[in-house]
């Protein structure tokens, strides 16, 4: 599986993991503390380490974590593990974050998501939230033998390639592809307007082209729709209506439904396949796909950020937001100078 290319045996990450309950189907680290980024993040001292823990039973996991790490939680800890798990699963993007935690000498933020919710997001892009994180290079710290999860991780990467190719011209570079892929989960994200440095996607991709290549190389080589000139770093994609229809038909279900919603006239109620056939012949096919992605990401990012006010608590939310705004301000100043 392509994701295994970035499997990490980092001792430091495993030491952090030892502070938490062991029942994890997947644990991964991401962000500027793991992979170098350009822009303001490049000059950060001791950047916060971002982690995601995937668990089969959120109620049981939070119950154990409350015993081990009571101080990590906001006032919601007083409501117990069932309420915490209900908030995790039923609001926002299905993930519960505890930010600004001091652990093993590092400042960390960790999110908890159920295995079932993650698999659904990877396959269908219901929220394109944690699925979006996993379209970029990550460090896998722990992963069990859940074959459904492994298959979903691989499908998410293949869907990212197909979606990005639909928004690109017939010929493009590896870097063009990776920029489109990295930008999928930021498309429509309101945090790109408030709190995130605008060139974030470029800052992620530019220093990490090799890591993106490692993640996607085998998928690009096997994709029958793609001509991958690996040594030249160039690619070609079939832009015929037939080729685009084939690509559209393999997109995640929620993305297909959003395309149908955008294109379907009021009262018509066409089925999805009929709509995709029309879009495949449309010169603006890529723009329609981009708009559909935004319609998934925007509400998801707003709901998740609103939930963060409660899961993090007001004090941590203010501190965390100020760190984000400070990073954005530094990005503006570096461009102006």
UniProtKB/Swiss-Prot annotation:
GO terms for molecular function: phosphatidate cytidylyltransferase activity. Keywords: Lipid biosynthesis, Lipid metabolism, Magnesium, Membrane, Mitochondrion, Mitochondrion inner membrane, Nucleotidyltransferase, Phospholipid biosynthesis, Phospholipid metabolism, Transferase. Its EC number is 2.7.7.41. It is a peripheral membrane protein. It is an enzyme of class 2 (transferase). Belongs to the TAM41 family. This is Phosphatidate cytidylyltransferase, mitochondrial. It comes from Mus musculus. The lineage of its organism: Eukaryota, Metazoa, Chordata, Craniata, Vertebrata.
């Amino acid at each position: 599986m392509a994701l295994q290319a970035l499997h990490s045996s980092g001792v430091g990450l495993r030491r952090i993991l030892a502070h938490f309950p062991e029942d994890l189907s997947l644990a991964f680290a991401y962000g500027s503390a793991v992979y170098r980024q350009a822009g303001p993040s490049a000059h950060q001292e001791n950047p916060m380490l971002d982690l995601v823990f995937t668990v089969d039973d959120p109620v049981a996991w939070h119950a154990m974590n409350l015993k081990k790490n009571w101080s990590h939680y906001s006032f919601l800890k007083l409501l117990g593990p069932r309420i915490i798990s209900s908030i995790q699963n039923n609001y926002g993007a299905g993930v519960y974050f505890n930010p600004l935690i001091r652990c093993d000498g590092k400042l960390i933020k960790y999110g908890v998501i159920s295995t079932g919710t993650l698999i659904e997001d990877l396959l269908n892009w219901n929220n394109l939230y944690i699925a979006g994180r996993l379209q970029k290079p990550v460090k896998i710290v722990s992963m069990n033998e859940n074959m459904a999860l492994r298959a979903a991780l691989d499908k998410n990467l293949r869907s990212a390639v197909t979606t990005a190719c639909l928004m690109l011209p017939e010929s493009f570079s590896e870097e063009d592809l990776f920029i489109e892929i990295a930008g999928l989960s930021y498309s429509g994200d309101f945090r790109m307007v408030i709190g995130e440095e605008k060139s974030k996607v470029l800052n992620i991709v530019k220093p990490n082209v090799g890591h993106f290549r490692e993640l996607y190389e085998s998928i690009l080589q096997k994709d029958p729709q793609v001509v991958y000139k690996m040594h030249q770093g160039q690619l070609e994609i079939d832009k015929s209506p037939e080729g685009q229809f084939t690509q559209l038909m393999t997109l995640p279900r929620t993305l297909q439904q959003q395309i149908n919603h955008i294109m379907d006239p009021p009262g018509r109620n066409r089925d999805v396949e009929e709509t995709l056939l029309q879009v495949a012949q449309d010169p603006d096919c890529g723009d329609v796909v981009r708009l559909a992605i935004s319609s998934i990401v925007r509400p998801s990012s707003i709901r998740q950020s609103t939930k963060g006010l409660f899961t993090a608590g007001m004090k941590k939310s203010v501190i965390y937001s100020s760190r984000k705004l400070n990073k954005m301000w530094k990005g503006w100043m570096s461009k102006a100078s």
